[in-house]
Amino acid sequence: GLWDDLKAAAKKVVSSLASAAIEKL
């Protein structure tokens, strides 16, 4: 459903930000 899509998108964003942050360390 829409909520599941939003949660999936949020997880992707969080993962991307986390990866970028780790690479900068």
UniProtKB/Swiss-Prot annotation:
Keywords on record: Behavior, Secreted
Keyword Secreted: yes
Keyword Secreted: yes
GO cellular component: extracellular region
Subcellular location: Secreted
Cysteines engaged in disulfide bonds, as pairs: none
Tissues in which the UniProt entry reports expression: Expressed by the skin glands of male frogs.
Major localization class: secreted
GO BP annotation list: male courtship behavior
UniProt function note: Stimulates aggressive behavior in male frogs. No effect on female frogs.
Protein name (Swiss-Prot/TrEMBL): Aggression-stimulating peptide
Biological source species: Leptodactylus fallax (Mountain chicken frog)
Upper lineage: Eukaryota, Metazoa, Chordata, Craniata, Vertebrata
